[in-house]
Amino acid sequence: MADADSANPQFLEWVKEWLDLARERNSKGVTTYRTAYNSLKACPISFEHPAQLQQLKGFGPKLCERLEQQLKKHCEQNGLPMPPHPRSRKAAPVTSDENGEGSSKPAKKARKQKAYVPALRSGAFALVVGLSTLDEDTATGMTKAELIEVAQPYCDASFSAPSDPTKFYTAWNSMKTLLQKELVYERGRPLRRYALTDEGWEVAKRIKDTDHWQAEKDRTKDPTSAQPVIPNFQPGAISRQKSPSVEIAEPAQALSEYQNVVADGLTTSDDASLPNFTPILLPPGTFTVQLVLDVREVRAKTDRDYMQEELAKQGAKPIMRSMELGDAQWVAKCNDPNLLSSQGAEGDEVVLDWIVERKRLDDLIGSIKDGRFHEQKFRLQRSGVKKVIYIIEEIGMDPEVINRYAEAVRSAIASTQVVNGYFVKRTNKMDDTIRYLTRMTAMLKRTYESRSLHVIPTKVLTSQNYLPLLKHLRESISPDWYITYPAFSSLASKSESITLRDVFLKMLMTIKGVTGEKALEIQKCWKTPYDFVKAFEACGPGEQGLKRKRELVFSQTSHLVGRKKFTKPLSTKIAEVWGNT
């Protein structure tokens, strides 16, 4: 239907103008205006005043007020009377009978719809408050991890672990409600970002106008009165009254402190372009091996410190911080905090070749369903860490759910072991996981504290040369090379930024049968999607061209053996996707 044929062409024209303007500016209001435009265009009812539009989807008080101002301006310019506001119209007088008494009861006053304000310290409340810490004009938004970190102190429930181990739901599920009410919009794939819509900002302002807001601000500032699920650790050692053996050895580091430690650099073409350097040597006795645990590793909202307290009781006191990758790992912590800095490095920790990804069975099923499982393994591969351990915790779940996803879980575990070469450890409960981490810590102490560590200086590292350099050193000199924790975190944070190379690999891996190894071999022959498409176009038309397309990948990779080898049927399948065969 054309805009001119709409029941409200003038209102529709103005909303369309604002929608086009929002698109030009790449504004966050695009979603709101598009929803309002579509609902108004589809509505067959004619409205006199913009206030009446609030009954349509996408029209909030702010948009209706803007339309009202536009209508006033339009009426003044064209000498037209301004339609009366629906609320200002007087009710018709009640007719009386001969005795002067009303023949009917007065009409009931319409009940005004209450403006939405989420419940205090609920998931929706915390998410709105967290997003309102952004500047109202910003278009960047927050990632899920960034938003959870900001929102958690304002919520009683956990954003990472269900309050009941038998349930799937966390406080993050409130995001669905906010998206449905169009208070929040999301954008970006695969890394989604969230921001408040205009209506969302109105809700945030209403929250901050309530009597409870000042008390809530004071509560989150005072760590003794607030009980967030993820503690907001302050710099320095903090001892807990509940368990004197537990102390936070180091504060959580912000992403911005590590993000630019390692430069991006240029692409490394061959071994000759790799840097030469003198390694930093850490002799035995100059460091101790310590476990690092992610602060988000909690059992439930009532036992947020259970894991670190139990580890401390068993002699494996963890360093608590927000980790860029994995849920636990081990570092060599220098006895002299200035040892590394005196040799041109940063920090006082060196990352060892062990990292742990812990997953409860319900989280594993969820990550398989939404693709996070493969995304996490992809990032772990790019970390350069040789020994990756997947701990899978069994929990009480609905047998129907377990049976439904049993095959997917078995396939994921087998793939992790066989294709990725990672070790999978299955435990029955968190206590078993804690005992396993304790034993691993003791074993790694015995293994590493009696040997020297060769550390690659951060100044020679770039995000482009890190993996080729590590591979070259391990193959030609020694299998054991290490980097500092700040450098590792910087590289891990950069791995979230998807490059064209990463996108190409992921595109290839969507084809059934193309593993990560096979995708890498294709990329060695054709660096970009453009090169790959051009190679198929060069095969020419007709039957002969079709045959060449189907055999293109097979013929170019015929030297490969084992898991990297391409079969003719797989080559044909790739041609069907990329070569329009």
UniProtKB/Swiss-Prot annotation:
This is Crossover junction endonuclease MUS81. CDD domains: WH_MUS81 (cd21036), XPF_nuclease_Mus81 (cd20074). Interacts with EME1. Its cofactor is Mg(2+). It is an enzyme of class 3 (hydrolase). Belongs to the XPF family. The keyword Transport does not apply. The keyword DNA damage applies.
